[in-house]
Every structure is written in C-alpha cells, then in structure tokens.
Amino acid sequence: HQQLDVVTYGEAMAMFVAAEPGPLAQAGQFTKRIAGADLNVAIGLSRLGFRVGWMSRVGRDSFGGYVLDTLALEGIDASCVTVDPRYPTGFQLKSRNDDGSDPVVEYFRKGSAASHLSCADYVAGYVLGARHLHLTGVAPAISASSCELAFHLAREME
C-alpha cells in the first residue's frame, strides 16, 4: 500500500434517482448514482488530493462492479474491499423533489454484503498506515459484526 492519508469504511449502494418529480411508484426513469455516507466522504477527500482507502464488502454482482469501478475512477484504494459471492450489494430508490422538500428514499440493503462486514474482513495494519481513520455511526449500525469492526479499527488507531 502507498501511505494513505485517510481510511474509512462503510456500505456503498447503487442509488436510482427518479428522473421526474412525483411518487416513486409512478417513476418510469431513473438515473444511477453511487450512495453511502462514508464513501461520499472518501470521494470528496480523494477529489481534494488526499490518498484515501475504503474498506467494505460488495456483492459479486453488477452493483458491486459499479462500486468498484467508481472507486477506481475516483482514485480510492480498494485493496480492503471484499467481493462477496453470497450476498448482494444493496441499492436504494430516491424520489426527485423540485420543491425543496426532502426526497423519499427506499433502501434495499437487508442482508447486503456490507451488512456482513466483520473483523474477518480486516487486513492487519491497514489503518495503521493511514494518518486518519474516519468513522461515522452509519456503518456500525448496519450489523453487530460491523459494529465490532468499528471498535477494532478505533482501538488499532489509539
């Protein structure tokens, strides 16, 4: 690994944003984007010139491929991303609102590859090579095993 400035981890999902305002049930066209709080931070930091690593699990599916392609395009180290043949990459649907109100978001993430993140996914020393570990409450909230991983990472950075 090159020396990383920041390591973060979490769940990435494919996000489909309705092309027109209105209820999701009536939406006929969507634009595919990437979603995930921790990944958004990683992308922003990489665009600012920081060397960023991101840890996660994605499914061996089209959405997982989309996440990996996005990481490569954004220059984010994905050497600690596990491709899981058993569980899918999550996705979400998001309404489009032109009136400034909050959009409706429907998540399809239960049983996702990222919800199976655990200490077994961690490559020893990965965060020690970074200057900063970025954690939020989102990734630890998706499963008990992901929460254990968050505490393991934080302890390693002490």
Locate predicted features.
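A glycine-rich helix N-cap at a beta->alpha junction
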Residues: L68-Y87, S95-D98
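Short phosphate-binding loop-to-helix
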Residues: D38, P85, T89-F91, S115-L117
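Glycine-rich phosphate/adenosyl-contacting loop at the front of the ribokinase-like
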Residues: H1-D77, L117-C119
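Ribokinase/PfkB-type carbohydrate-kinase core domain
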Residues: H1-V7, T70-A72, D98-E158
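Short beta-strand scaffold segments in enzyme catalytic cores
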Residues: I43, F91-S95
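A common structural microfeature
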Residues: R51-V52, G90, V104
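Acidic, glycine-rich active-site loops and adjacent beta-strand->loop/helix elements
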Residues: M13, R57-F63, P85-Y87, N97, ...
